[in-house]
Amino acid sequence: MPRRREVAKRVILPDPKYNDRTVAKFINAIMLMGKKSTAEGIVYGAFDLIAERSGEEALDVFKKAVENIRPMLEVKSRRVGGSTYQVPVEVRADRRNALAIRWLILYARGRGEKTMVERLAGELLDAAANRGAAVKKREDTHRMAEANKAFAHYRW
């Protein structure tokens, strides 16, 4: 831990099209090798495809998808007397969002569709409907925490 001043958190400006900070973070997470305009093209293209396929507002579908993927609990390894326990801990609000976005992108990249726009749109629509690989990841994380509830008293 630093003994000097605490580092100020950088403020991420909302994205230009939807004026939303979560979308801006999502674009930044999609971005590879500093190519922000490409990342914006992928995200906005996926949003257009979502609006076309579902007939709903793309931003609402995105928000619902992120909400459905956010984990409430996770496990952290804690070493106690020679053995390591998986201790369930509650996830902070900012980390919940970060994990949801990270999982969405990870499982969208692993899908079988041809373009990233189609993959991302498919994963977002699946997540909004409470199905898909990212939702399964959240369920697995919660299941792990539930299975290790006996070690909750090791929390720090």
UniProtKB/Swiss-Prot annotation:
Query: Which molecular-function annotations from GO does this UniProt entry contain?
Result: rRNA binding; structural constituent of ribosome; tRNA binding
Keyword list (alphabetical) reads: Ribonucleoprotein, Ribosomal protein, RNA-binding, rRNA-binding, tRNA-binding
- Gene Ontology cellular component list: small ribosomal subunit
The record's annotation in InterPro entries points to:
Ribosomal_uS7 (IPR000235), Ribosomal_uS7_bac/org-type (IPR005717), Ribosomal_uS7_CS (IPR020606), Ribosomal_uS7_dom (IPR023798), Ribosomal_uS7_dom_sf (IPR036823)
One GO-annotated biological process of the protein: translation
Q: Name one Pfam family in it.
A: Ribosomal_S7
State its role: One of the primary rRNA binding proteins, it binds directly to 16S rRNA where it nucleates assembly of the head domain of the 30S subunit. Is located at the subunit interface close to the decoding center, probably blocks exit of the E-site tRNA.
Q: How does it assemble?
A: Part of the 30S ribosomal subunit. Contacts proteins S9 and S11.
Q: NCBIfam families, from UniProt?
A: rpsG_bact
Q: Which family does it belong to?
A: Belongs to the universal ribosomal protein uS7 family.
Output this protein's name: Small ribosomal subunit protein uS7
Native organism is Syntrophotalea carbinolica (strain DSM 2380 / NBRC 103641 / GraBd1)
Q: Give the gene symbol.
A: rpsG
